[in-house]
């Protein structure tokens, strides 16, 4: 049975038969250890003869192999593809948003042009950049993206600018209308001006923090049902929108599909932003050993929903490479994909996963086989 849920983590049932799945490895290692009391084992094991040390290393390697790391991803993880560019500049456009839609579109266009003039080959816009962020506004500002033209002036602008400037644009997100449904949708345009991918926010922002903030996107929006990964002139990119970043399974699926970079247009608020915004970006980058880029609207203290700001680029070691505060800003930062292999060689997580204990299942890829 096909499922709209794209992934799941589960424990391999064969291990439930053994309450201590490590016991067989421990018994193997004990053949090389002298009979020691618990108090003295640390000092004595430091003095093992070289032959025993070599044997332990050999067993350690054998153990790692028997952990079946290749089975920790179902289907197996794809190799990291060779990107079209090794180094390039990304532009993060942290924009102010008003109730004037025409102004918002014109303002975003100018910001994209400025980022490109400063060398950006990839430009990322914020979540809901053409509309105020509210359930009342989503139906009013929604566009029929598939119809294009006058039915979707925001995406028409993105298409024109990406083609003219020969850049890739991750178009933040806008409210999308499809029949009687509304989605929070990110459009990706290639350097030829063509729409290469469309990501509808999978995890809707429904929260209630007493005394702080309550917001229910599900009052007006419908959740998307498909993870989105796209090959572009600047590499393979996985797309999420704001709340999507909280779900590590989505990022893990993108990494297993060979993503170089994850892009999350988002609008964290003044409650969750200070605590979680940077933390989640660094976690997704570190766990999956890839780049993570985020872009927020600029803060407007007079708006009904106040964004945290702090658009950021994080490297594959979890390091913050570039960020800003809450005001309008255009960040230009370099991405170097050669670092991905360096980090993955230094910390070979893909060869150390415990496929004998857990697996990440990419339901979409599995169903397509």
From Swiss-Prot:
Span of domain CN hydrolase: 88-337
Subcellular locations according to the entry: Plastid, Chloroplast
Entry keywords, A to Z: Acetylation, Chloroplast, Hydrolase, Plastid, Transit peptide
GO molecular-function terms, A-Z: omega-amidase activity; zinc ion binding
Residues recorded as bearing N-acetylalanine in the entry: 64
A single GO cellular-component term on record: plastid
Transit peptide region: 1-63
EC number of this enzyme: 3.5.1.3
Enzyme class at the top of the EC tree: hydrolase
Active site feature: 127 (proton acceptor), 201 (proton donor), 242 (nucleophile)
Name of the protein: Omega-amidase, chloroplastic
Gene this chain is encoded by: NLP3
């Amino acid at each position: 049975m096909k499922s709209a849920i794209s992934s799941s983590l589960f424990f391999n049932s064969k291990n439930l038969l053994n309450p201590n799945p490590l016991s067989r490895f421990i018994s193997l290692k004990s053949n090389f250890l002298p009979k020691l009391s618990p108090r003295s084992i640390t000092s004595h094991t430091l003095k093992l003869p070289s032959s025993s040390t070599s044997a332990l290393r050999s067993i350690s390697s054998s153990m790692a192999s028997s952990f079946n790391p290749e089975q920790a991803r179902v289907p197996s993880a794809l190799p990291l593809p060779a990107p079209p560019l090794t180094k390039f500049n990304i532009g993060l456009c942290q924009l102010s948003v008003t109730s004037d839609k025409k102004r918002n579109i014109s303002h975003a266009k100018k910001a994209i042009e400025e980022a490109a003039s400063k060398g950006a080959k990839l430009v990322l816009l914020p979540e809901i950049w053409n509309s105020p962020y509210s359930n009342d506004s989503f139906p009013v500002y929604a566009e029929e993206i598939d119809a294009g033209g006058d039915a979707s002036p925001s995406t028409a602008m993105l298409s024109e600018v990406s083609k003219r400037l020969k850049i890739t644009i991750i178009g933040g997100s806008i409210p999308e209308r499809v029949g009687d449904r509304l989605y929070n949708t990110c459009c990706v345009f290639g350097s030829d001006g063509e729409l290469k991918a469309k990501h509808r926010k999978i995890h809707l922002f429904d929260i209630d923090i007493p005394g702080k903030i309550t917001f229910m996107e599900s009052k007006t929006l419908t959740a998307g049902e498909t993870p989105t990964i796209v090959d572009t002139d600047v590499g393979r990119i996985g797309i999420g929108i704001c709340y999507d970043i909280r779900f590590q399974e989505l990022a893990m699926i993108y990494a297993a599909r060979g993503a170089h970079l994850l892009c999350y247009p988002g609008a964290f608020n003044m409650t969750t932003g200070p605590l979680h915004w940077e933390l989640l970006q660094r976690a997704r980058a570190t766990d999956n050993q890839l780049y993570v880029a985020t872009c927020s609207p600029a803060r407007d203290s007079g708006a009904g929903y106040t964004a945290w700001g702090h658009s950021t680029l994080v490297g594959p070691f979890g390091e913050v490479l570039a960020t800003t505060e809450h005001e309008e800003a255009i960040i230009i930062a370099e991405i170097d994909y050669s670092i991905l292999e360096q980090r993955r060689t230094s910390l070979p997580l893909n060869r150390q996963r415990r496929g004998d204990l857990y697996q990440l299942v990419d339901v979409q890829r599995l169903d397509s086989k």
